[in-house]
A protein has these predicted regions:
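N-terminal Sec-pathway targeting helices
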Residues: 31-45
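N-terminal non-cleavable signal-anchor helices
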Residues: 19, 30, 48-51
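Non-catalytic all-alpha helical scaffold/repeat segments
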Residues: 61-312
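Short, aromatic- and cysteine-enriched interfacial helices/patches
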Residues: 29-32, 57-59
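Hydrophobic membrane-insertion alpha-helices, especially the h-region
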Residues: 41-55
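C-terminal region of N-terminal signal peptides and the immediate post-cleavage residues
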Residues: 52-64
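N-terminal cationic amphipathic segment used for targeting or macromolecule association
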Residues: 4, 14, 42-44, 265
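N-terminal intrinsically disordered, acidic low-complexity segments at the extreme N-terminus
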Residues: 1-27
Length: 312
């Protein structure tokens, strides 16, 4: 077996997991949806179980339990720690409390960023509620709309599992709320790529949306998810795979630029907003325009993160 084949097999093995109770999606890179099967397989450490029990009894335990999870070394470990807490909160109808606690942890420097964790919480909330409208109404635009994105992503996957994806109308009822509607368009893109694992097919599916802005926001979600799907790899495999997330895609120049910018943005999440580490990923993209777009995406994410630390 050559090194490239071995690396591909390792990437698929590291990424393999059940999403929203459905089989891994086509294309070898599974979706990032719910982890109910994973919870049953992995269980939770005794200290985490105690934290969940006292979560709603002792107010300070909310920040403590979340900060304990945030202190874990990798995104995958953090997510596994947080998921049982998120499910407990969703079942207790305390979505706002979780989101406000996450933003507080960002402001105080305990948590590097809460956007991806809010994505994850959105997945869990939808799984518990089973309704896009109810899940969207339970939360808010905290963590740069991450919660909204996650809810819609999960809703698309759920609809696909029942064979009835019709994204043209999924966000219609949110048109009176500009933030939620914009986040819904973007979340559709995340969800589409989770369903089919194919960037070009997902981009075509976005074309069914009613307006140019809606379509582009959907494509933006596809391109962001295209880089996010490497986040759970160990660093060695992340370095080998993430820089090439856009290689071989027949995108327009503008979309290719955005795709490469997402490599830099997501590298900032992977490296907890270490700009130099993200730049190392960008320098491996393989061409000057791609490298530059990637570095721009990393810089823009740094600015966004700094603002979030000030305002939540």
């Amino acid at each position: 077996m050559d090194d490239e084949t071995a690396d591909t097999n390792e990437i698929q093995r590291k990424s393999a997991r059940v999403t929203h109770g459905q089989p891994d999606r086509p294309g070898g890179v599974p979706g990032r949806g719910g982890r109910k099967t994973l919870w049953c397989t992995l269980g939770a450490a005794a200290v985490l179980e105690v934290a969940i029990i006292v979560w709603w009894i002792v107010p300070s335990s909310k920040s403590s339990a979340l900060s304990d999870c945030a202190g874990l070394a990798t995104h995958a470990e953090q997510r596994r720690c947080l998921d049982p807490i998120f499910e407990n909160a969703a079942r207790s109808e305390n979505a706002q409390t979780v989101l406000h606690t996450l933003t507080k942890l960002v402001r105080t420097g305990v948590l590097d960023d809460c956007h991806l964790f809010a994505h994850e919480f959105g997945h869990v909330e939808f799984e518990v509620q089973g309704s896009l409208a109810i899940a969207m109404g339970a939360g808010d635009a905290s963590c740069l709309n991450g919660y909204y994105h996650g809810v819609v992503e999960a809703a698309v996957y759920h609809a696909a599992s029942e064979g009835k994806v019709d994204i043209a109308d999924m966000c219609r009822d949110l048109r009176g709320d500009d933030l939620a509607y914009d986040a819904c368009d973007h979340g559709l893109g995340h969800g589409l790529l989770n369903v089919n694992g194919d960037v070009m097919q997902s981009r075509e599916d976005c074309a069914s949306l009613p307006g140019n802005y809606d379509r582009q926001r959907c494509v933006d979600g596809v391109l962001m998810e295209n880089s996010m799907r490497y986040l759970d790899l160990d660093d060695g495999h992340y370095r080998k795979s993430a820089p090439h997330a856009c290689a071989g895609l027949s995108l327009s120049p503008a979309d290719l630029d955005s795709c490469n910018a997402e490599i830099g943005e997501i590298a900032m999440f992977h490296y907890k907003h270490n700009l130099n580490a993200a730049f190392e990923i960008c320098q491996a993209v393989g061409n000057s325009s791609g490298d530059a777009a990637c570095e721009r995406g990393a810089r823009e994410e740094l600015v966004t993160s700094q603002r979030a630390h000030q305002s939540g």
